[in-house]
UniProtKB/Swiss-Prot annotation:
Class of the enzyme per the UniProt entry, highest EC level: ligase
Organism field: Rhizobium meliloti (strain 1021) (Ensifer meliloti)
Binding site for ATP: R221, D222, E223, E488, G540, I541, D542, R543
Region entry Aspartate, spans: 199-202
Alphabetized NCBIfam families for the sequence: aspS_bact, PRK00476.1
Official protein name in the record: Aspartate--tRNA(Asp/Asn) ligase
CDD domains: AspRS_core, EcAspRS_like_N
C-alpha cells in the first residue's frame, strides 16, 4: 500500500465496503458522540467520515488530534446505517473505521477559522492565505478558475488559434498606466518594464507572418488601487488575427465566449445573440459604456417636453444653452412618493442638487401625474412624457438635466440604483453584448488638449482622411468591447498597420514622427516591411471567473492577491533591497522628505 494513501477523501463508495484502505488529509472537524470519535477527514478532493471507537487501537491517537492537523488513517470501509447516511456528501453512504492513525503534522492554534465562511478581516486572511485557501468556497473558486482557463485554451485551439508566449521583460511604454520597472545590472541606469499587455508583441507576430495567436498573458500595471482591479498583476486571454475586419473577430470570439459561459454558468441563461450597441447609444440609453442589460430601464431624451414649460429650472437651462438636454429615467413599479423621495435623497448624497420626478396613479378612472414637476409642467406635457416612455399606473420617472457629457455618468448610476431598488434586475442570468464605434479621440480637460480615448494603435474609421478632419472628436475607431452584466470583460480593435496613418494619429495628440519612432520604434519599423491588416482583443480572465463563480470581488478568485495598498502580506512584498543588491544595480535610494 502507498505510504500515504490508497484513495482520496472523495473516492470511497458503497462498492468499497469491506475494503482496507489508507487515507491522508486534514482534520476538518472532530465530534464526540457517546465516547465514539467522529473525524471529518478532508483533502483537495473531498471529505470522508472516520470513526474511532474506544476499542480501536487508533482511539488513543484520535483523542489527541485537533482541527487542521494532518493525519494518515488506515482502516476498514463500512456502510452507514440508513438513518446516518449523509446525502450531502459523495462519500456519505460509508465511513472508515480507523485501525491506525499517524499524525503527519500538528497545527498551532489557527489565526482564522477555515470551517464555514466567516467574515474575517481581509489583512488577516491575506497574511495567512495558505489557511484561507482551505476554505471550501475559495478552494472551489481557484479550482474553477483553472478549469475555465483550460477550457479557454481548448476552445481557442479548436477554432484554429495557436498559443505563443511573449517576453515578460520588455521596454517601457508611455501609453496607459505606470509601468513596473526592473533595473538592469548589466546596463547601469537603464530599466526593463513588465508588460502592461502584449499589445505590440502580438502585432509584431502578425507582421512576422503568424496568424491566430493567443496566450494566457500576465499583465502588470502600477495603478492606484481600484475596487474592480487587483493591484499589481492580472491575467487576460490575449489574441490577434491577420487579414480580418472587426466582424471576423466578433464572429470568432462570440461563439467561443458564449460556450465558456454556458459550460460554467451552472444552468443560468446566457445571451444567445450578443447585441451590438454603438458607444453613443449606450451612453444615451444606459449612461455607461458597460451597461448591465439585466436592468430593463432605458433612458430617453425628453427635452422638448420641458422647453418653454412652467418648470422654470429646466426651461431656463434649455433656453440659455443649446447643449442642455433633459433625460428621463423610467422606473416601472416605482410610483410611490416614498420611493421617489428615497431616490431624491440618494441623489443629494451623491453631491447632486436632487432628482426631479413624476409618478402616476389613478384618480377614479383618470391616470394622473403627481409630484412637483407634474404640477409645474401641466397635464398635457405630463401625459406626453408618460406616453413616450410607455408608463402606466404605479410607475415613476426621474429626470436629469444639463450637458450630457457632464451628467451621463450620474444618470447611469441613477438608472442602476432604480433598477436595484425596485428588484428589476434578474441576477440569475448572463447578459452579454458588444459595445462598438468608440470615439478615437477625447478631450483631456486637465491638459486642455485632444488625447486618445482608448487604444492608440486602433484603426480610425475613415482612415487618413478622417485624421485630417477639423472635428477630431467626431472620429470613431474600429474598436469594440464585450460587456457582461455591467462589467467590461474584453476589449479590442482593428489595428492601424500604416506608418503614415500611425504618425498622423499621434501628431493629432501632439507627438511628432520622431516621438513615434523613439517610443514605438519596433512597431513603426515593422509596419514599413509589409504589415497585414490585423485585429484582435483581450479578455479579462479574472473578471470572467468572478462573474461565473459569483464571487463578490477579485480576491475571491485569486490565489495570492495583494491588499488594496499593493502589499503582499504573506511574502512581505514590497521589501527593501540590501545595500549590496543596490550597489550591483547602481541604485542609490533618495530618502523622501517628510511633510
Amino acid at each position: 500500500m502507498h505510504r500515504y494513501r490508497s484513495h482520496t477523501c472523495a473516492a470511497l463508495r458503497k462498492s468499497d465496503v469491506g475494503s482496507t484502505v489508507r487515507l491522508s488529509g486534514w482534520v476538518h472537524r472532530v465530534r464526540d458522540h457517546g465516547g465514539v470519535l467522529f473525524i471529518d477527514l478532508r483533502d483537495h478532493y473531498g471529505m470522508t467520515q472516520v470513526v474511532a471507537d474506544p476499542d480501536s487501537p487508533a482511539f488513543k491517537t484520535a483523542e489527541t488530534v485537533r482541527g487542521e492537523w494532518v493525519i494518515r488513517v488506515d482502516g476498514a470501509v463500512k456502510a452507514r446505517t440508513d438513518d446516518t447516511v449523509n446525502k450531502n456528501m459523495p462519500t456519505g453512504e460509508v465511513e472508515l473505521y480507523a485501525r491506525e492513525i499517524e499524525v503527519l503534522s500538528a497545527a498551532k492554534e489557527l489565526p482564522l477559522p477555515v470551517f464555514g465562511e466567516p467574515d474575517y478581516p481581509e489583512d488577516v486572511r491575506l497574511k495567512y492565505r495558505f489557511l484561507d485557501l482551505r476554505r471550501e468556497t475559495l478552494h472551489k473558486n481557484i479550482v474553477r478558475r483553472t478549469e475555465i482557463i483550460a477550457a479557454m485554451r481548448r476552445r481557442m485551439g479548436d477554432i484554429g488559434f495557436t498559443e505563443y508566449t511573449t517576453p515578460i521583460l520588455t521596454a517601457s511604454s508611455p501609453e496607459g498606466a505606470r509601468d513596473f520597472l526592473v533595473p538592469s545590472r548589466i546596463h547601469p541606469g537603464n530599466f526593463y518594464a513588465l508588460p502592461q499587455a502584449p499589445q505590440q508583441y502580438k502585432q509584431l507576430l502578425m507582421v512576422a507572418g503568424f496568424d491566430r495567436y493567443f496566450q494566457i498573458a500576465p499583465c502588470f500595471r502600477d495603478e492606484d488601487p481600484r475596487a474592480d482591479r487587483l493591484p499589481g498583476e492580472f491575467y487576460q486571454l490575449d489574441l490577434e488575427m491577420s487579414f480580418v475586419e472587426q466582424e471576423d473577430v466578433w464572429d470568432a470570439m462570440e461563439p467561443m465566449i458564449r460556450a465558456i459561459f454556458s459550460d460554467f454558468a451552472g444552468g443560468k441563461p446566457v445571451t444567445d445573440k450578443f447585441p451590438r450597441i454603438p458607444y453613443d447609444t449606450a451612453i444615451r440609453k444606459y449612461g455607461s459604456d458597460k451597461p448591465d442589460l439585466r436592468n430593463p430601464i432605458e433612458m430617453q431624451e425628453v427635452t422638448e417636453h420641458f422647453a418653454g414649460s412652467g418648470f422654470k429650472v429646466f426651461a431656463n437651462m434649455i433656453a440659455s444653452n443649446p447643449k442642455v438636454e433633459i433625460w428621463a429615467i423610467p422606473a416601472k413599479t416605482g410610483g410611490s412618493r416614498a420611493f421617489c423621495d428615497r431616490m431624491n435623497a440618494w441623489a443629494q448624497s451623491q453631491g447632486q442638487p436632487g432628482l426631479g420626478y413624476i409618478f402616476w396613479r389613478k384618480e377614479g378612472e383618470k391616470l394622473e401625474g403627481a409630484g412637483p414637476l407634474a404640477k409645474n409642467i401641466g397635464e398635457e406635457r405630463t401625459d406626453a412624457i408618460r406616453t413616450q416612455l410607455g408608463l402606466e399606473d404605479g410607475d415613476a420617472c426621474f429626470f436629469v438635466a444639463g450637458e450630457p457629457a457632464k451628467f451621463y455618468k450620474f444618470a447611469g448610476e441613477a438608472r442602476t440604483r432604480a433598477g436595484e431598488e425596485l428588484n428589476l434586475v434578474d441576477r440569475d442570468r448572463y447578459e452579454l453584448c458588444w459595445i462598438v464605434d468608440f470615439p478615437f479621440y477625447e478631450w483631456n480637460e486637465e491638459e486642455k488638449r485632444v488625447d486618445f480615448a482608448h487604444n492608440p494603435f486602433s484603426m480610425p474609421q475613415g482612415g487618413l482622411t478622417a485624421l485630417s478632419s477639423d472635428d477630431l472628436l467626431s472620429i470613431k475607431a474600429f474598436q469594440y468591447d464585450m460587456v457582461c452584466n455591467g462589467f467590461e470583460i474584453a476589449s479590442g480593435s482593428i489595428r492601424n498597420q500604416s506608418p503614415e496613418l500611425m504618425v498622423k494619429a499621434f501628431e493629432n495628440v501632439g507627438l511628432s514622427q520622431a516621438d513615434v519612432e523613439e517610443r514605438f520604434g519596433g512597431l513603426y519599423r515593422a509596419f514599413q516591411y509589409g504589415a497585414p491588416p490585423h485585429g484582435g482583443m483581450a479578455f479579462g480572465i479574472d473578471r470572467i471567473v468572478m462573474l461565473l463563480v459569483g464571487a463578490k470581488n477579485l480576491r475571491e478568485i485569486s490565489l495570492f492577491p495583494m491588499n488594496q495598498q499593493a502589499q503582499d502580506l504573506l511574502m512581505g512584498a514590497p521589501s527593501q533591497a540590501t545595500p549590496a543588491q543596490l550597489r550591483e544595480l547602481s541604485i542609490r535610494p533618495i530618502p523622501q522628505k517628510k511633510d
